[in-house]
């Protein structure tokens, strides 16, 4: 049942709390990587890389899925007349560009990073092999999953849910440019409330604009929690991993 303004974490300061999770899947929206424009905003990518590096140094295993919305959005291109399958593949290539950019910034932070793609691109990334991804994580490396599922009609939100389940992550950390899940769009409804806890079923039934229903159904069916939080607040990834009271926790 949804709970406006209730605690779901310890609330201690970052650095004082032992991480609540040992392996997480971080889902990043591609639009944020562009800073609201087409292309990459190096300042945003650096902010994200620095936050991930902080978490990895604390001993948490981090895998990442990135969208490609700062380059292409298949559904929107389809609305303008482009064939959906082709436009989806273009979007997958955009996610690989974002993945390589994040890899570069993470390695500048001293974090060993591997990119695995669902479409074979041997010169720039490894193929997606779940057991190899787990081995990388166990060695303290960040693994970034690019090219979505490698299939049209599947979003990167669904990719994040599937990859999280396959690598044995304990939670999907869904990073947004808003503080969490609201009862309505806060930009349109001044009475919209931030929900600190809600179930997967409620999100789906109420049509709350968080992620696509396929991703939430997959997480609901397999008991995978999702934490929706604001990525653009510095230190929020570490707070999320520590179980602090931020964002919205979605559980079964």
Swiss-Prot record:
It catalyses: UMP + ATP = UDP + ADP. GO terms for molecular function: ATP binding; UMP kinase activity. Belongs to the UMP kinase family. ATP binds at residues 27-30, 69, 73, 182, 185. Its EC number is 2.7.4.22. UMP binds at residues 68, 88, 149-156. The keyword ATP-binding applies. GO terms for cellular component: cytoplasm. NCBIfam families: pyrH_bact. InterPro entries: AceGlu_kinase-like_sf, Asp/Glu/Uridylate_kinase, Uridylate_kinase, Uridylate_kinase_bac. The keyword tRNA-binding does not apply. This is Uridylate kinase. Catalyzes the reversible phosphorylation of UMP to UDP. Inhibited by UTP.
